[in-house]
Each structure stands twice: as structure tokens, then as C-alpha cells.
UniProtKB/Swiss-Prot annotation:
Biological processes, Gene Ontology terms: ribosomal small subunit assembly; translation
Matching SUPFAM superfamilies: YhbC-like, C-terminal domain (SSF74942), YhbC-like, N-terminal domain (SSF75420)
Lineage of source species: Bacteria, Bacillati, Bacillota, Clostridia, Eubacteriales
Subcellular location: Cytoplasm
Gene3D superfamilies named among the record's database cross-references: Ribosome maturation factor RimP, C-terminal domain, RimP-like superfamily, N-terminal
Species the sequence originates in: Clostridium novyi (strain NT)
Protein name per UniProt: Ribosome maturation factor RimP
InterPro entries membership: Ribosome_maturation_RimP (IPR003728), RimP_C (IPR028998), RimP_C_sf (IPR036847), RimP_N (IPR028989), RimP_N_sf (IPR035956)
Chief subcellular location: cytoplasm
Function: Required for maturation of 30S ribosomal subunits.
UniProt record similarity statement: Belongs to the RimP family.
Keywords carried by this UniProt record: Cytoplasm, Ribosome biogenesis
């Protein structure tokens, strides 16, 4: 995946070994521009959960390698955090991991009368994401999906 300013594959190759060496999962990396500032956001996860100290530890190590290799020419803020309880499902791996869990599917356009559908993630393929909603299967075209969020259990 290529960003206008940076090569995300290169960033991933630098960061992933560090995160894994510290016994965390690299959940996702994004480089975004918000309010005229650039942010490199690194989401980490662990079966034990993530706390502030975990984020600080990863941030220090990642910051060192990014300063050394300097893969981003523009100035940016580095943020390390947990993906949260109601996390966005970005990848096929995420969808696979959370199959049979409650999700919220946010859509760009109306589909079956709504821009948001909530249900149990049953399956997915290249074309559709299938959820079970009120004992009915709904096949949602992937090209209409803006975001899929894991529904947190409170």
C-alpha cells in the first residue's frame, strides 16, 4: 500500500519486527493528515490487552528506528495505541479472526434501507460480507462498505 508521502510497506517492515520482539501484535498502521498535521498511528494488540506502559515501550523503540532510517520526509506525530474494544476491522485477517462476532457495518450509500447494519459476522469473500441480523442473512457488497467495526461487549 503506497501513501503519497511514504511507502507503508517499508514502514511496516521497519515496525513489525520491533513490535513482535516486544511480544505484541502489530494490528494496523496508518499515516493520516488531520488539521494540517501528519500522524503515523500504530495500533498494537495483545491477548492480555494493552496499557499505557505498553504503548510507551513500543513508541520509544519505534521512534528510535524511524529516527535512524528516516523513511518519512515530512514532519509527523507518532501515536501508538490499542485498537480499542470497538476496533475497526481493516484486513482479511481481522475479518477471519472476528468471524462469529457482532460487527457494525458502515456504508457509503443506503443498502436495504440503511447506511449502517449490525449483526453477527458469518462469512466474507472478495465481493461480500455476510452478517446475520434478526435471524436473516444479509450479503453486503464490499464496494459499498466504508468501515467495519467490531461491536464491543460491555
Amino acid at each position: 500500500m503506497k501513501n503519497n508521502l511514504i511507502n507503508m510497506d517499508e514502514i511496516n517492515k521497519l515496525i513489525k519486527p520491533i513490535v513482535e520482539e516486544l511480544n505484541y501484535e502489530l494490528y494496523y498502521i496508518e499515516y493520516v493528515r488531520e488539521q494540517n498535521e501528519n500522524y503515523l498511528r500504530i495500533y498494537i494488540d495483545s491477548s492480555k490487552g494493552i496499557n499505557l506502559e505498553d504503548c510507551e515501550k513500543v513508541s520509544r523503540k519505534v521512534s528510535d528506528i524511524l529516527d535512524e532510517k528516516d523513511p518519512i520526509s515530512d514532519s509527523y506525530y507518532l501515536e501508538v495505541s490499542s485498537p480499542g474494544i470497538e476496533r475497526v476491522l481493516y484486513t482479511e485477517e481481522h475479518l477471519h479472526k472476528y468471524t462469529n462476532n457482532q460487527i457494525i457495518v458502515k456504508l457509503a450509500k443506503l443498502f436495504e434501507g440503511s447506511r449502517e447494519h449490525q449483526g453477527n459476522l458469518i462469512s466474507f469473500n472478495d465481493d461480500t460480507v455476510t452478517i446475520e441480523k434478526e435471524n436473516e442473512s444479509i450479503n453486503i457488497p464490499r464496494e459499498r462498505i466504508k468501515k467495519i467495526i467490531l461491536k464491543g461487549e460491555f
